[in-house]
Amino acid sequence: MTREELIAWATRNGWKLDRWGHLKKEFDNGTHRLKLSRIAARHEISTPFGWARLASGYLKNLSINADGKLAGMNR
């Protein structure tokens, strides 16, 4: 999966790009972020102390499964 494919999937599912090029979305348990780098993505949640990593994975290992969900991230 490429960075552009990940951004396209995320924006179709309600994620919004912030000014730093990361994707954010509000959930019942708080703000989540997909922090994108050149080769990897991290799924993080906002805490009172900053961002905490929930899962991460290299873009080459990420894919969209049959249910339309992101697969390939490790905890």
Q: What spans do the regions from the language model cover?
A:
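Short amphipathic alpha-helical "recognition" segments used for binding
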Residues: A8-W9, N29, M73
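Generic detector of ordered, mature protein regions
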Residues: G14, R19, L36, A71-G72
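Compositionally biased non-globular segments, especially hydrophobic aliphatic-rich helices
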Residues: T11-N13, A55-Y58, K69
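Short intrinsically disordered terminal tails
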Residues: M1-T2, G68-R75
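Acidic, low-complexity, intrinsically disordered interaction modules
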Residues: R19-N65
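Negatively charged, low-complexity tracts enriched in Asp/Glu with abundant Ser/Thr
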Residues: M1-K24
